[in-house]
Swiss-Prot record:
GO terms for cellular component: extracellular region; extracellular space; host cell plasma membrane; membrane. This is Defensin Lucifensin. PANTHER family: DEFENSIN (PTHR13645:SF0). It comes from Lucilia sericata. It is found in: Secreted; Host cell membrane. PROSITE patterns: INVERT_DEFENSINS (PS51378).
Length: 92
């Protein structure tokens, strides 16, 4: 059993080294973007804005208002609070 395990591990290592040495580099032309027209064809990534992350996610830990206030201070406001709909409202 021990011989079989040593043989199996050695075989897997040898197989991975051989497959790495046989790998071909990617074509440079495949990912090359040339010019303004090519940039227009690339679709922008869509990112969702979750306004309730500070108040909703941290409400179970009991730090929801202080996390919202810290978030607002980092944005340059005077502080903030979580309203009834669990949205962080920053003071000006």
């Amino acid at each position: 059993m021990k011989f079989f395990m040593v043989f199996a591990v050695t075989f897997c290592l040898a197989l991975s080294f051989v497959s790495q040495s046989l790998a071909l580099p990617a074509d440079d032309e495949a990912h090359f973007v040339d010019g303004l027209e090519a940039l227009k064809t690339i679709e922008p990534e869509l990112h969702g804005r979750y306004k309730r992350a500070t108040c909703d996610l941290l409400s179970g830990t009991g730090v929801k208002h202080s996390a919202c206030a810290a978030h607002c201070l980092l944005r340059g406001n005077r502080g903030g609070y979580c309203n009834g709909r669990a949205i962080c409202v920053c003071r000006n």
